[in-house]
């Protein structure tokens, strides 16, 4: 311990002027921010694991591998799309010179000197991959794998980055307060899924004579496990959105925790003890708090989470009554929960309600409406165009009945069941 103090003293003794001291401290601060962003980004990356488990548990066992593959592909192609297009589009729009400069940088030898830029790029990437993965749960069990890959590529390379650029994280053409992405990430993903669900149509047997027929998932414990895995990653999602170690907020951690609790309690009450709705309510509470996690009080976070959780089974049934087959409930869990969180931020973020202030309810409503129109409209159009380009959006009736694990990947998730 004494040796460490001497080394530190020697270091400052060698700093003979203010300039060298400032330079050393700046280097240390940059290194700390790089470390912070990478660690927080890895936590967010863990959410891919959570999504895979949450979605995997909610589909039938004949489609589990397909869900896992889609989640892997979201990440794999998302990395490439974000590197060459998405990462620069979200900050610079369609500025051709910015693209050229970025491509020169990534194809050149300047990478080691841009550690903070690359850490920020990585943190943006994991957010983008989250938005794309949300769509997977809504269109499960009947979409062609090739169609999904193309949809995911366009979301990560174009639709998500453009939405970021238009919103508060980019040029703020449509401004609203969205600290960690209730609308930018989750709302967008949920409403892109809604548009794709409408274009795709329901699974075989999901509706008979216009009446909904439940199709149960194969493993509820897996889904619950996935919800808790997502919750762990959410601390990186929200706390990491400060983007700098020096700006980290304990309030964000507290409001995130209380919203998670509120979401689970709300869904538990509204669903009358349904395990799957409660697990999804936890996620909905976390989605809703993202927008105002830095400006509402912990009690405000609890209220936001509670309302987001209460609406999950209600909105799920409304979507079902509309004849739409949202397999994993991504519309209520991400879409409407994101909208609720954004709008309530404009209320509970006000100082009169114990918030930090600096938010506008009108801006929050405008942002929510913009997200709904942008996401649903482009999700529907994209799915239709992809279907035309590939000669169909869905697998055949025979393949759907067989299950996408065998039809698309030639491998069952539980092969021991085929052994006599």
Swiss-Prot record:
The keyword Transmembrane helix applies. GO terms for cellular component: plasma membrane. It is a multi-pass membrane protein. It is found in: Cell membrane. GO terms for molecular function: ammonium channel activity. It comes from the Archaea. The chain crosses the membrane at residues 34-54, 71-91, 120-140, 149-169, 180-200, 220-240, 250-270, 273-293, 295-315, 339-359, 365-385. One of its GO terms (biological process) is ammonium transmembrane transport. InterPro entries: Ammonium/urea_transptr, Ammonium_transpt, Ammonium_transpt_CS, NH4_transpt_AmtB-like_dom. The keyword Nucleus does not apply. The record marks 186, 334 as: Twin-His motif. Important for optimum substrate conductance. Keywords: Ammonia transport, Cell membrane, Membrane, Transmembrane, Transmembrane helix, Transport. Homotrimer. Interacts and forms a complex with GlnK2. Belongs to the ammonia transporter channel (TC 1.A.11.2) family. Involved in the uptake of ammonium/ammonia (NH(4)(+)/NH(3)). Transport is electrogenic. This is Ammonium transporter Amt2.
